Curated annotation (Swiss-Prot):
Subunit structure: V-ATPase is a heteromultimeric enzyme made up of two complexes: the ATP-hydrolytic V1 complex and the proton translocation V0 complex. The V1 complex consists of three catalytic AB heterodimers that form a heterohexamer, three peripheral stalks each consisting of EG heterodimers, one central rotor including subunits D and F, and the regulatory subunits C and H. The proton translocation complex V0 consists of the proton transport subunit a, a ring of proteolipid subunits c9c'', rotary subunit d, subunits e and f, and the accessory subunits vah-19/Ac45 and vah-20/PRR.
Natural source organism: Caenorhabditis briggsae
Purpose of the protein: Subunit of the V1 complex of vacuolar(H+)-ATPase (V-ATPase), a multisubunit enzyme composed of a peripheral complex (V1) that hydrolyzes ATP and a membrane integral complex (V0) that translocates protons. V-ATPase is responsible for acidifying and maintaining the pH of intracellular compartments and in some cell types, is targeted to the plasma membrane, where it is responsible for acidifying the extracellular environment. Subunit H is essential for V-ATPase activity, but not for the assembly of the complex.
Family named by the database record: Belongs to the V-ATPase H subunit family.
Gene Ontology MF, one: proton-transporting ATPase activity, rotational mechanism
Protein name: Probable V-type proton ATPase subunit H 2
Chain's gene name: vha-15
Record has Amino-acid biosynthesis as a keyword: no
Highest taxon, organism lineage: Eukaryota
């Protein structure tokens, strides 16, 4: 059986927290369609009419089970639901059928297999006939359908695969990207929570840039309930060791660390700490584990843990997580070199004027290390020059490219081969004066041969321009 995320953190039940979809569904249930009129007008078939009215009139789960059993063997239940969803014209009535369908699966998870078996008999998947509904214009219909698809994918033993899975994850990611306009974001997050509890779905989500989409959503303005749901999805992903070791390079730790340093909601704090514990436990490669720990330290996680340790929680899991992380992160700090610190900062993409950037000793001792892993650090710095809009990051990256060139004899050649010279020169026309200043210094270092002369010239330029190096 596939690994499913387990911990004493509430599972996907917390999803039943009131959402826009659930509020609207309550109203939809009270507006039953006039199926008799549809039948008399020959807009639905007699089999569909008989089944849906019998199911509506059933007063208990036992009675509903009897209706389902009577229509299971011949596949009529699955056929009727598909017919009513795809053939009924009015959105209001499609809303009703989808809500009925969702309630049916929520009441008894095993019912999903009825739909999978019926689809199998038709040599198709249960998902394929419903994925097209996600393109409808009515947002309630789209999100209720999405919720049903997630249940079909998670409640039984049949899993979504191939193009169906790619299409569905692509849909969910688009919904996440529209976080400012998507009024059903809690439903989108709920579907992700359900899907990512199953290891079979995690890899596909990651290879289609799902993690980056999650991180972007987390970095946006979200209420704490949605924040919790999105972090829950991240937590689920960290149960997979291959995914856990990618988290330092995908901005996951930094995003969670920023939220941790500001959040006052205990359940948000707990899920972040549980995610950090997973990452450190799952990653076996010493270097990656060390980098992950260092990113946590840079996000002031130790300070948060210190404050939490002063409180007393009636939760042994939380206490264990606080103790484990405190020990691991403290050890990582003690075993830290200046290059480790610098490397982690560069990999995180969040450059600041930390002491190492201005340390002559650091550059003398470590410039050659920029060539490790096929010039990884140089490539990251150049990528930041090309893609970042943050003046501070652009200043520091320009400065570091210049220092690398100054301290490594072949640095100019390496930077030019990686298109770094062009990236720096483009910043000579940047709006921010400090960016222009540091770009100019870097360009001069890329072109000059006499370093003693350059040092005097830079001092003179700085005094003349009156620009402070920030």
């Amino acid at each position: 059986m596939a690994e499913v995320a387990h911990h004493n953190i509430p599972a996907v039940d917390m999803i039943n927290a009131t959402s826009r979809l659930q509020l609207e569904a309550a109203e939809v249930r009270s507006n039953k369609p006039n199926w008799g009129s549809y039948f008399r007008s020959k807009m639905i078939q007699e089999d569909d009419y008989t089944l849906v009215t019998s199911y509506e009139n059933a007063k208990s789960k036992d009675e509903r089970d009897q209706v389902i059993a009577a229509n299971d063997a011949n596949g009529q239940l699955a056929k009727t639901m598909a017919n009513l969803i795809t053939q009924v014209a009015k959105d209001q009535n499609v809303r009703y059928v989808l809500t009925l369908f969702d309630d049916m699966l929520q009441e008894d998870k095993s019912r999903v297999e009825i739909f999978h078996k019926a689809a199998h008999r038709q040599k198709r998947t249960a998902f394929s006939q419903y994925l097209g509904i996600l393109q409808r214009q009515d947002n309630f219909i789209v999100n209720q359908m999405s919720s049903i698809i997630a249940k079909l994918a998670c409640f039984g033993v049949t899993r979504m695969e191939g193009q169906d899975l790619q299409y569905y994850f692509s849909f969910l990611k688009e919904q996440l990207k529209n976080s400012t306009t998507n009024e059903y974001m809690n439903t989108t997050a709920r579907c992700l929570q359900m899907m990512l509890r199953h290891d079979e779905y995690r890899h596909e989500f990651v290879v289609t840039d799902g993690v980056q989409t999650l991180v972007t959503a987390l970095n946006g303005k979200t209420n704490f309930q949605l924040q919790y749901q999105l972090i829950f999805s991240v937590w689920c992903l960290t149960f997979n060791a291959d995914i856990a070791k990618k988290t330092p390079s995908l901005g996951v730790i930094t995003a969670l660390g920023d939220i941790l340093s500001e959040s006052t909601k205990e359940k948000v704090i707990r899920i972040i700490l549980a995610s950090f514990v997973n990452i450190l436990n799952k990653v076996e490669e010493r270097e990656i584990k060390r980098e992950a720990a260092l990113q946590m330290v840079q996000c002031k996680t130790l300070k948060t843990l210190e404050l939490m340790d002063a409180k007393k929680y009636d939760d042994p899991d939380l206490e264990d997580d606080v103790k484990f992380l405190t020990e691991e992160l403290t050890l990582s700090v003690h075993d830290l070199s200046s290059y480790d610190e610098y490397y982690s900062e560069v990999r995180s993409g969040r450059l600041t004027w930390s002491p190492v950037h201005k340390s002559e000793k650091f550059w003398r001792e470590n410039a050659a290390k920029f060539n490790d892993k096929q010039y990884e650090v140089v490539k990251i710095l150049i990528k930041l020059l090309e893609s970042s809009s943050d003046p501070l990051i652009l200043c520091v990256a320009s400065h570091d490219i210049g220092e690398y060139v100054r301290h490594y004899p072949r640095g100019k050649t390496v930077v030019e081969q990686q298109q770094g010279k062009a990236a720096v020169m483009r910043l000579l026309t940047a709006e921010d004066p400090n960016v222009r200043y540091h770009a100019l210094l870097a360009v001069q270092k890329l072109m000059v041969h006499n370093w003693e002369y350059l040092g005097k010239q830079l001092d003179s330029d700085a005094q003349g321009d009156g620009v402070a190096a920030k």
